[in-house]
Swiss-Prot record:
InterPro entries documented for this protein: Ribosomal_uS19, Ribosomal_uS19_bac-type, Ribosomal_uS19_CS, Ribosomal_uS19_SF
Role summary: Protein S19 forms a complex with S13 that binds strongly to the 16S ribosomal RNA.
Gene: rpsS
An example Gene Ontology CC term for this record: cytoplasm
Pfam families: Ribosomal_S19
Molecular-function annotations in GO: rRNA binding; structural constituent of ribosome
Family, as annotated: Belongs to the universal ribosomal protein uS19 family.
Protein name as annotated: Small ribosomal subunit protein uS19
The keyword Glycoprotein belongs to this UniProt entry's keyword annotation: no
Keyword entries, A-Z: Ribonucleoprotein, Ribosomal protein, RNA-binding, rRNA-binding
Matching NCBIfam families: rpsS_bact (TIGR01050)
PANTHER family: RIBOSOMAL PROTEIN S19P FAMILY MEMBER (PTHR11880), SMALL RIBOSOMAL SUBUNIT PROTEIN US19M (PTHR11880:SF8)
Amino acid sequence: MSRSIKKGPFVDAHLTKKVEAAVAGKDKKPIKTWSRRSTILPEFIGLTIAVHNGRQHVPVYINENMVGHKLGEFALTRTFKGHAADKKAKR
């Protein structure tokens, strides 16, 4: 289920403050955040946001195709190493 349009997109208040400060100050330093649930807004375009994936902050450069998605979609939390190979199938 998607979010109601009358409610509007959700963005954490502390992230909004950091983005506004970065845009006003023309700061190119990545913005660190743990807020994976925040929606990407058009104001974020051109910024680099370091999104926490549970272990480290993954830098995500925001472009216009990402608007409307959540920040957590671009910082993967699970690492797939592959299934164990079957020894009989290799021969």
